[in-house]
């Protein structure tokens, strides 16, 4: 695949579980078909929304294989494959590549609070270990560290397979620095559904979306409209779904989105600890909004 394929509407896929907490492979296959039919450009299993910290390496590889096989070339398959140990992150990236992932989404090393040089070296080792494109996942609200624009651009300049960043913050100064300084091969994606419109208006390349789990066609239309310069249509879609986007984070992701998908009859509402169901009040608000949108 080309690095230029890392654009458009990408879904941060949930991992469906059975009541015994095993992977619900039937539901997983149906989710992949749902996204293929909706026109999703990129499907990303085993990320934060997929409860990756609760998956063992064998489960991650199995999920990637299933998604790859069911996607049948209709969507690009990028897989979450990151952790805070560089050695383990390299192993996960290799395993994902071996399982058929066409790109890797690798989260910044969390908890350790490394220096920018430590972050650079972390991604350098991953880039040298795999041949597929790598998406840097910068989510300072979860990791406790920010991958600076300078570090991201340094990596993009030094390694041809450092192909994109998922910028999951509202730091528009950093976003502008990335968009202005990036090399031609490098994509900048937002990880914030509520910011799709302003992000795309600045010249961003797309979104890695939680809301695409429940409204993939709408997210795809929003991204495509903004990319085509049809801002009036993009504003209409953004206004329609803005409250839903907000409610998907009323509690820690992925609890609200899995609750929503269970309401839609697409998965069972089963989580692996420490993730637990949302409160009754959050459930009520989600239900009201989804009913108003005709989703349930």
Swiss-Prot record:
Name of the protein in its database record: 4-hydroxy-tetrahydrodipicolinate synthase
Q: Lineage, please?
A: Bacteria, Pseudomonadati, Chlorobiota, Chlorobiia, Chlorobiales
- Entry similarity comment: Belongs to the DapA family.
Q: Which PANTHER family match?
A: 4-HYDROXY-2-OXOGLUTARATE ALDOLASE, MITOCHONDRIAL (PTHR12128:SF66), DIHYDRODIPICOLINATE SYNTHASE (PTHR12128)
Reactions listed under catalytic activity: L-aspartate 4-semialdehyde + pyruvate = (2S,4S)-4-hydroxy-2,3,4,5-tetrahydrodipicolinate + H2O + H(+)
Q: Which GO terms describe its molecular function?
A: 4-hydroxy-tetrahydrodipicolinate synthase activity
- SMART domains (UniProt xref): DHDPS
- Which EC number(s) does the record attach to this protein? 4.3.3.7
State where pyruvate binds.
49, 208
Instruction: Name its species.
Output: Chlorobium phaeovibrioides (strain DSM 265 / 1930)
